[in-house]
UniProtKB/Swiss-Prot annotation:
The gene is tmcAL. It catalyses: cytidine(34) in elongator tRNA(Met) + acetate + ATP = N(4)-acetylcytidine(34) in elongator tRNA(Met) + AMP + diphosphate. One of its GO terms (biological process) is tRNA modification. GO terms for cellular component: cytoplasm. Catalyzes the formation of N(4)-acetylcytidine (ac(4)C) at the wobble position of elongator tRNA(Met), using acetate and ATP as substrates. First activates an acetate ion to form acetyladenylate (Ac-AMP) and then transfers the acetyl group to tRNA to form ac(4)C34. Belongs to the TmcAL family. It comes from Streptococcus sanguinis (strain SK36). GO terms for molecular function: ATP binding; ligase activity, forming carbon-nitrogen bonds; tRNA binding. Its EC number is 6.3.4.-. Keywords: ATP-binding, Cytoplasm, Ligase, Nucleotide-binding, RNA-binding, tRNA processing, tRNA-binding. This is tRNA(Met) cytidine acetate ligase. The keyword tRNA-binding applies.
């Protein structure tokens, strides 16, 4: 049977995600961000609720990306997720994108010229942000010209890099309906951004989310719920450079900006520069919030849920892949579990996120 992998956040799960799943063939494996997502913010609802949404819409297996894969720039996010999906035996990696391109050919370009391309990237001036450097690299070697306002396309290129040299085929699907950041909605599709801004509108959620009942009833977490904890971390930590990827320049900028910032948006706005994008700053603040330091990624794969087909696939992997279905005395990934504890501070109605939790079985 064909095995299709999808890398996702489902923040929250909407009709566009359902459409993507419907286009996938064979067994459908989702590598999903945990309780913090790639752009450096808490997921609007917890990982278990989002896994349930995916299973109800046709996913066969949902696994959790570790924190230090979930909260990363596109290239590192893609590589970490593909590393995990490859171990689970995927044949295809499917993703939505704003651009209709031959990503397979782009992947081959990187496979043939990876060393030159990375050397070119490293030689670009530090005054450029990482996304700007990446855009310059693709323009130079593949003739691609794109803006930073198409995040799914940027991720598509990151996936092309990540699968280069692997026995995984890329399958891109044209993004349906509203753009990634769009606040508008058409007859069938609304962006995750629009949904996050309309959480108090049941009719809107019912129209654009297949599992609206789960989204409406699940405890929500947003940055403002955690901002006071971030302030505490910054004020009480003697050296912010101890946290993952925080350099001295950023540590100073963050401390100065905090004095006149009352919200996370104000803090990000004041810290960000041309070189340090807002997305990067949000990720750094998330690292500080959860106390992230450089750590090895876990060897095991944490399973959040499965269908009967997914269960059968897992049984074939036993002995070949370290599968984690219950987190007990021995941690799966201590940093992810630490991040989950911080996430729970955002809403007292949240259930325990790790201990005693077992994978969701679809239909039971």
């Amino acid at each position: 049977m064909t095995v299709t992998g999808i890398i996702a956040e489902f923040n929250p799960f909407h009709n566009g995600h359902k459409y993507l799943l419907e286009q996938a063939s064979g067994l459908k494996i989702i590598a999903m961000s945990g309780n913090f997502v790639q752009r450096g913010e808490p997921a609007i609802v917890d990982k278990w609720t989002r896994a349930q949404m995916a299973l109800e819409a046709g996913a066969d297996l949902v696994l959790e990306l570790p924190f230090l894969v979930s909260v990363q720039a596109a290239d590192f996010f893609a590589k970490g997720a593909v590393d995990i999906l490859e171990r689970l035996g995927i044949d295809y990696l499917m993703f939505g994108t704003e651009e209709v391109l031959d990503y397979e050919s782009i992947s081959k370009v990187y496979g043939e010229k990876a060393e030159q391309m990375e050397a070119y990237l490293a030689g670009l001036p530090d005054s450029l942000s990482y996304p700007q450097k990446t855009q310059a690299m693709w323009q130079e070697f593949a003739g691609l010209n794109f803006s930073g306002s198409t995040p799914n396309h940027i991720l598509g290129l990151a996936y092309a890099k990540a699968v280069a040299g692997r026995d995984i085929k890329l399958c891109s699907i044209q993004r349906q309906g509203a753009g990634y950041h769009s606040l508008s909605a058409n007859q069938e599709f609304a962006s995750a951004t629009a949904l996050r801004q309309n959480l108090d509108q049941p009719d809107f959620l019912k129209k654009f989310t297949p599992a609206h009942h789960l989204l409406e009833t699940a405890p929500k977490v947003i940055w403002s719920d955690l901002f006071s904890y971030l302030r505490y971390q910054i004020v009480t930590c003697p050296d912010l450079t101890n946290f993952y990827q925080v350099n001295q320049e950023l540590a100073v900028r963050i401390r100065v900006a905090l004095k006149s910032s009352e919200t996370i948006e104000e803090l990000v706005e004041q810290v960000a520069t041309k070189r340090y994008t807002k997305a990067r700053v949000r990720r750094l603040l998330t690292y500080i919030l959860v106390g992230a330091r450089q750590e090895e990624l876990p060897s095991g794969v944490h399973i959040l849920g499965f269908s009967e087909q997914g269960r059968q696939h897992l049984s074939q992997l036993k002995g070949k892949v370290e599968l984690v279905s219950r987190i007990g005395k021995d941690p799966w990934d201590s940093l992810t579990q630490q991040a989950d504890k911080v996430y729970q501070l955002g809403n007292p109605a949240l259930r325990e996120q790790n201990f005693g939790r077992v994978p969701i079985m679809k239909g039971k």
